[in-house]
Amino acid sequence: MTTNFHEKADTYLEATFDALEAQDEDALLEVDLEGGILTIELEDGRQWLISKHEPSGEMWLSSPISGGLHFSNTDDGWTLTDGRNLSTLTSEEISEASGAVFHL
């Protein structure tokens, strides 16, 4: 896969990590970014994993709410074929599950 994919994916993962860390004032989340995998865990043990998948050029989300989803890079960010955005979906799910508001 191209360097461009890695740059976009890494930039997305780092920005998401930074945004969650900055907004988690009540320490509701355990957020880790290692080896191209962003792990977001709530105190109750529920986890979201966001990872780059080089062979397909996609970002993959594993969620306790929506299951496994694959997002393609588009002009609107990382999106599903139905138009849902990775940042929006992740923000909504984590906000709902944690009881706090997170914006990505």
Labelled PLM ranges:
Residues 1-49, 53-104:
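N-terminal intrinsically disordered, cationic/polar leader segments
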